[in-house]
């Protein structure tokens, strides 16, 4: 017999689900630029050099628990009581040692699916909504995706082979503020981290 196969995109046109459950949007850790302190305080703009249509700082989870500030001159982690994040400005202020260099590692939501963004830029798509991501390991999203796939299989009994492709958790594709590839890692799982998973 002839096998009929078809691809389906689980996330395609599912922005409504992701918007209702922002805490279950995919995340990755980002690291700020290295900045040298000129005095006893320093402000670092976290999203400098990152594409803000693709990534958004995670302010839902406690920065003091999930972020890390490092004095790159000494290699020491800066205590959490020595820094504060100003959500309105998107800057983190640190009590510093003059002329020491600092970075911030922080969580960010992937608010534009990187594969979709890549195709959007490469193919010069117009009038196409940015596709949001969501993390299928999180409880509500996991159930939603299982239900959606089950219904699709029931609605398509004539299909006997389903091929899954482009599991984004398998690689990382991060763009800079000029829509260029800033960080690409095809064999890692950098974009599959979250407080839920780290717990």
Model-identified regions with their sequence ranges:
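A short acidic, often aromatic-flanked loop/helix-cap motif at beta-alpha or helix-coil junctions
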Residues: 18
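A cross-domain feature marking catalytic cores of carbohydrate-active enzymes
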Residues: 13-15, 166
């Amino acid at each position: 017999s002839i096998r009929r196969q078809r691809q389906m995109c689980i996330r395609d046109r599912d922005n409504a689900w992701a918007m209702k459950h922002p805490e279950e949007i995919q995340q990755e850790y980002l690291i700020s630029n290295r900045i040298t302190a000129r005095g006893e305080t320093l402000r670092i703009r976290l999203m400098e050099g990152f594409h803000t249509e693709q990534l958004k700082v995670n302010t839902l989870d406690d920065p003091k628990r999930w972020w890390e500030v490092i004095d790159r001159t000494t290699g020491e982690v800066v205590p959490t009581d020595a820094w504060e994040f100003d959500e309105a400005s998107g800057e983190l202020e640190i009590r510093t040692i003059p002329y020491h260099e600092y970075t911030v590692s922080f969580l960010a939501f992937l608010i534009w699916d990187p594969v979709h963004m890549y195709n959007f830029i490469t193919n010069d798509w117009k009038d196409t909504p940015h596709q949001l991501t969501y993390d299928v390991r999180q409880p509500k999203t996991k159930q939603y995706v299982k239900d959606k796939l089950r219904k699709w299989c029931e609605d398509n009994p004539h299909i006997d082979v389903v091929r899954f492709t482009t599991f984004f958790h398998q690689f990382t594709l991060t763009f800079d503020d000029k829509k260029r590839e800033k960080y690409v890692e095809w064999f890692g799982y950098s974009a599959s981290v979250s407080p839920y998973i780290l717990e």
